[in-house]
């Protein structure tokens, strides 16, 4: 029998439906993290570089702290970073070195899946 897995997009993309481009803040995410961890998702599509920039610009929150806190609150479920090519928190193309550094930081702070 074929195995079916589910990837949840609530905190990365789905939240924009109700809260506009600024999305959920860290406290809102942490409030649902334990339930999401128990739900049995293959992964939670957690963030993008744009999502991280929005956390800083509009919510005045640290996206790295958000990632670490969510990881601690949902330790069993993989967290995904949706990459948009060769850019990170900018519309400008980033160097390979910067992207490698950004990906290392993401892994070190709790991301374990890239899409």
Residue spans for each PLM region:
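Charged helix-capping and loop-helix junction motifs
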Residues: 60-64, 96-101
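Acidic (Asp/Glu)-rich catalytic clusters
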Residues: 37-38, 67-76, 103-108
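Structural preference for beta-strand elements that scaffold enzyme active sites
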Residues: 3-6, 14-16, 43-45, 76-82, ...
